[in-house]
Amino acid sequence: MQRLLGSIVILATVFTFCEATISSACLRCICNVESGCRPIGCHYDVYSYSCGYFQIKENYWEDCGKPGTSFKACANDYTCASNCVRAYMKRYIGSSGCPANCESYARIHNGGPRGCRHPSTLRYWEKVHQQGCNVNS
């Protein structure tokens, strides 16, 4: 019985860790960096278009599960775009090798699935941090 309870505690801990999600505060800081948190449309940026509140690229939208009616429509709708970012983070934080915190989420948003491990995303994190977020936001 004690062994069974120990297994349940371990499974609950693993489940909780895997279910970590990006906070609304962290989302807002990323949104502020990307667009001033406005639906600014699409701009050509690094070989493809980046659109909307979070300047989402089409492959990012595909990775988050293609919510909404289209890539551009979702990116320019705050609720849809936020849900896309949440789904993207949920998909990749566990395999990134980084802790589930605002810094990791921001760096993954900027640098892709393992962006939290790339030194090139530290500058982006500083911009997010300047919006009032910290690692634990």
Swiss-Prot record:
Pfam families: Destabilase (PF05497). Keywords: Antibiotic, Antimicrobial, Bacteriolytic enzyme, Disulfide bond, Glycosidase, Hydrolase, Secreted, Signal. Its EC number is 3.2.1.17. The keyword Hydrolase applies. The active site is at E34, D45. It is an enzyme of class 3 (hydrolase). It is found in: Secreted. Expressed in the basophil cells of the oyster digestive gland. PROSITE patterns: LYSOZYME_I. It comes from the Eukaryota. GO terms for molecular function: lysozyme activity. Has bacteriolytic activity. May play a role in digestion and in the host defense mechanisms against invading microbes. This is Lysozyme. The lineage of its organism: Eukaryota, Metazoa, Spiralia, Lophotrochozoa, Mollusca. The gene is lysoz.
